[in-house]
């Protein structure tokens, strides 16, 4: 059972919820003691593991038919078999139960933020809303990956991050979603799923990613007061730019480098926040 749960959680993407949570918490933390609060570790575990089980478990359950056409499920992810669907549903119920228990100990604002995360995580794939089949709503609903960071920030500060940070997060997560959906254009179209890349085509999708990531880069550099390392954020627009300028690069290959870039830059941001705030109290 544990092996099954691990497979559906898509460990390559744990960083997308867990990492966001850690960075959001570091952004709000002011003293080293903030990292010794028990609730920090409770939600650290939740957003790294159970949250991913919920997101991708729901996705695998509702995409069972369409996933039959996508070879990615055999190469990089786990393909759910028909006899496993009931077990998968039980796992989703389990994580839902854990989530409800956590909400019993949250204040009203925390419940609202947490509920938004669960709502978007579920209805991104599930009917009747199924945001993933609605152009422009598909990448917008992917803001679910930002919510753990907002929740963490509120957990430690009892306030919401600034608007410019929320906008920058939207630009990044939108570009990430569009970029990840481009390799699936052929399979989504065959399955009758109209994602943004299916709707506007590969080239316009790459251009939209380029625009989003350029604006994200400008926001990050400005917020960092032009600190030299902040210019590493320009790695993101290089991905769609390279594909737009060259016909020899396959997006299916370079897409799988993005989790490494996200992990490296996310880790760098976490360390930078700790140092900048002198949270360790060593300066």
Task: Set out the residue ranges of the language-model regions.
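Multi-pass alpha-helical membrane architecture of UbiA-family
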Residues: 1-283
């Amino acid at each position: 059972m544990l092996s099954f749960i691990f497979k559906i959680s898509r460990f390559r993407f744990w960083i997308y919820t867990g990492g966001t949570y850690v960075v959001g918490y570091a952004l709000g933390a002011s003293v080293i003691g903030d990292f010794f609060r028990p609730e920090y570790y409770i939600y650290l575990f939740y957003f790294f593991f159970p949250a991913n089980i919920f997101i991708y478990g729901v996705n695998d359950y509702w995409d069972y038919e369409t996933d039959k056409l996508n070879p990615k499920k055999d190469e990089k992810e786990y393909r759910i078999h028909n006899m496993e669907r009931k077990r998968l549903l039980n796992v989703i119920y389990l994580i839902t139960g854990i989530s409800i228990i956590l909400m019993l100990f949250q204040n009203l604002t925390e419940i609202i933020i947490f509920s938004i995360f669960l709502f978007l995580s579920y209805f991104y794939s599930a009917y009747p809303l199924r945001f993933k089949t609605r152009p422009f709503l598909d990448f917008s609903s992917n803001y679910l990956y930002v919510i753990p960071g907002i929740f963490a920030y509120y957990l430690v500060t009892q306030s919401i991050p600034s608007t410019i940070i929320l906008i920058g997060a939207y630009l990044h997560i939108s570009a990430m979603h569009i970029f990840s959906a481009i390799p699936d254009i052929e399979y989504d179209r065959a399955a009758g799923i109209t994602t943004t890349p299916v709707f506007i085509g590969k080239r316009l999708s790459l251009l939209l990613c380029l625009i989003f990531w350029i604006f994200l880069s400008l926001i990050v550099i400005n917020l960092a007061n032009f600190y030299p390392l902040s210019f590493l954020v320009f790695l993101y627009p290089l991905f769609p730019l390279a594909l737009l300028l060259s016909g020899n690069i396959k997006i299916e290959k370079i897409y799988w480098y993005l989790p490494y870039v996200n992990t490296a830059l996310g880790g760098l941001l976490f360390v930078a926040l700790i140092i900048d705030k002198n949270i360790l109290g060593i300066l």
